[in-house]
């Protein structure tokens, strides 16, 4: 099988079957792969003649041009069968056939190094919701196994979760309902770029380039958020909203769902209270409770008993010395996320040539950021460990 041709075919199928990925998977399994669906006689697509009509050479030509533009723009397209594809999302019965990714590090570094916890909720959040969204993310940053924070880059809970994660040195991933080159809302363009530059972070979508933010697209985005994460935390939600759909998707994928309780007379808490009442979500009673349920270890309080994060001291120190887009920052944060990593594994995680890995790791060790053992496995040096 020609891998490049198969990726082109997957990109084409992703456009055709974006709202019916499970159907595409069934067709691929029966035909023996994505490219096999574009033969002289495309297989019948029962109930969807409009989809069958698109299984032709013109769509493959479009996909080839699409992938060229993606690469030229500095983005990545990851097919469902690629080893870089998010492992939890691949386990879902209806995973996207491909993902467009924008980040400064390798997809493996984004998707495979640590647990992923989604924070979702209303755009119209209350001061109570904002406070507890921040406190919970801050507390998770102080656990033994800090997670990656996943959300949807929207106003309200999404934006607070992403920004707090960055402030605490946590990686964070934003799932968009637009093309990878568009950020919606536009007011979050700076936030998205900060995420793209941060180690272990980035933004992604399953929509082709040029896709506008129409309402229907957000259902697919919510499905991806639920599939990416080990657990979903609903911070605030009205009785109807996208975050409740995300919670239901998560339940269908056998993910853990948590909800922050709110006042009985606050419409912005009706959805959370209903999830708890109907036993569709576990109640969040404290940051310690959430961390324990997630299996991340007990969070350690900061000075004065506060959950406030330290601002990502290790990351800040690396950025100050080497720059926000430096190889030193990327490699240092990869070691911080996965201590005891050798040069070969770092080469795969960070995507640098082996000699450059040794050069950068040696510099970080000489500057007091890393230590190594006799097997040349690197870990953060005290006090960063």
Label for each model-derived stretch:
Residues 1-84, 367-384:
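Short, small/acidic-rich helices and loops at N termini and domain boundaries
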Residues 2-4, 79-385:
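Glycine-biased, small-residue-rich flexible motifs in mid-sequence functional cores and linkers
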């Amino acid at each position: 099988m020609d891998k490049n041709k198969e990726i082109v075919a997957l990109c084409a199928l992703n456009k055709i079957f974006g709202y019916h990925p499970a159907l595409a998977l069934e067709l691929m399994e029966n035909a023996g792969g994505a490219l096999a669906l574009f033969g002289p006689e495309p297989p019948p697509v029962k109930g969807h003649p409009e989809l069958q009509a698109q299984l032709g050479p013109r769509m493959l030509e479009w996909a080839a041009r699409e992938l060229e533009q993606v690469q030229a723009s500095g983005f990545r397209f990851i097919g469902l069968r690629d080893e870089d594809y998010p492992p939890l999302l691949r386990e879902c019965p209806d995973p996207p056939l491909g993902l467009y990714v924008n980040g400064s590090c390798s997809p493996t570094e984004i998707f495979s190094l640590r647990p992923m916890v989604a924070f979702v909720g209303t755009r119209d959040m209350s001061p109570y919701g904002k406070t507890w969204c921040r406190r919970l993310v801050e507390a998770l940053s102080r656990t033994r196994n800090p997670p990656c924070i996943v959300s949807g880059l929207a106003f309200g809970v999404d934006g607070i979760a992403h920004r707090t994660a960055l402030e605490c040195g946590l990686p964070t991933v934003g799932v968009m309902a637009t093309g990878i080159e568009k950020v919606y809302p536009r007011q979050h363009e700076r936030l998205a770029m900060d995420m793209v530059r941060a180690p272990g972070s980035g933004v992604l979508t399953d929509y082709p380039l040029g896709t506008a933010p129409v309402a229907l697209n957000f259902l697919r985005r919510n499905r991806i958020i639920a599939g990416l994460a080990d657990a979903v935390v609903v911070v605030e939600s009205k009785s109807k909203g996208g975050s409740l759909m995300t919670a239901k998707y998560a339940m269908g994928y056998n993910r853990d769902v948590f909800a922050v309780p709110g006042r009985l007379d606050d419409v912005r808490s009706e959805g959370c209270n209903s999830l708890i009442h109907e036993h569709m979500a576990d109640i969040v009673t404290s940051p310690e409770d959430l961390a324990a349920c997630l299996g991340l270890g007990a969070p350690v309080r900061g000075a004065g008993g506060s959950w406030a994060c330290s601002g990502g001291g290790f990351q800040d120190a690396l950025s100050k010395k080497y720059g926000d887009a430096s190889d030193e920052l990327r490699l240092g944060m990869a070691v911080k996320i996965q201590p005891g990593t050798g040069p070969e594994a770092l080469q795969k995680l960070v995507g640098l040539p082996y000699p450059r890995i040794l050069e950068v790791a040696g510099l970080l060790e000489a500057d007091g950021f890393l230590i190594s053992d006799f097997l040349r496995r690197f870990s953060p040096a005290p006090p960063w460990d």
